[in-house]
């Protein structure tokens, strides 16, 4: 009743200052005394929890070539056995402080920085919700991949492409002039192995089901064209071990 709702409530919490986190912290390593940090700590998942890592993401840092390459290394033969799939982002600003705020620039940046791993999927740009919260698309993609996996008894048989996400527009940076693009224009990204978000069917959805290795018209290993194909291959080989 109303009486139970009367009064005040206080709460305390700690918040991480992620501005102090460097690429080297995400990459991490293992010390001679057996301390694990960053991506290297993935090796602790199986011996401590008997769980197999199948997705690796680092939103906010995966746009760094050093971190992306470390993720690609970390996803292979974890504990000498398991393989995982990387979900990463392209930057909105490059290492020289130049904006990556158009489709043409995003495609050029991806190629120049070799964000083309077949064990990965990359996203651009970002997205914002009705409260002004900005999301890396890799964050939203991992949520939808996990949701789809759960609906299929943890079998990664469904892509996150065309899944609804809680945003209202694309985001290219606080000072960007870009007003966004539609599904048809977004195909320029997906044809170059870049997944994105578009307005479709009366809602905003993730768009693109290719791996980062895909380029339309290029000679691409058929198994590495679609994200779901690579994830299913990993699931099968992981299950056999």
Task: Identify the role of each PLM range.
Residues 21-240:
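A glycine- and small-residue-enriched flexible loop/hinge signal that marks low-structured segments
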Residues 1-25:
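Surface-exposed interaction regions enriched in Ser/Thr/Asp/Glu
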């Amino acid at each position: 009743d109303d009486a139970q709702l009367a009064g005040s409530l206080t709460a305390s919490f700690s918040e991480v200052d992620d501005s102090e986190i460097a690429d080297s912290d995400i990459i991490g390593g293992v010390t001679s005394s057996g301390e694990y940090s960053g991506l290297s700590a993935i090796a602790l998942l199986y011996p401590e929890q008997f769980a197999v890592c199948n997705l690796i993401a680092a939103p906010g840092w995966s746009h760094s070539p050093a971190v992306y390459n470390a993720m690609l290394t970390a996803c292979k033969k974890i504990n000498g056995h398991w393989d995982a799939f990387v979900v990463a982002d392209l930057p909105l600003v490059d290492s020289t402080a130049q904006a990556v705020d158009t489709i043409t620039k995003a495609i050029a940046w991806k190629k120049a920085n070799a964000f083309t791993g077949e064990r990965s999927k990359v996203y651009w740009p970002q997205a914002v919700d009705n409260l002004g919260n900005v999301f890396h698309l890799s964050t939203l993609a991992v949520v939808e991949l996990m949701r789809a996996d759960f609906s299929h008894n943890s079998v990664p048989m469904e892509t996150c492409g065309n899944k609804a996400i809680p945003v209202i527009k694309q985001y290219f940076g606080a000072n960007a002039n870009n007003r966004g693009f539609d599904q048809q224009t977004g195909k320029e990204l997906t044809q170059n192995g870049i997944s994105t978000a578009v307005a479709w069917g009366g809602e905003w959805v993730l768009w693109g089901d290719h791996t980062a290795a895909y380029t339309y018209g290029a000679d691409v290993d058929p198994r590495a064209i679609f994200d779901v194909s690579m994830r299913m291959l990993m699931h099968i080989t992981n299950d056999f071990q």
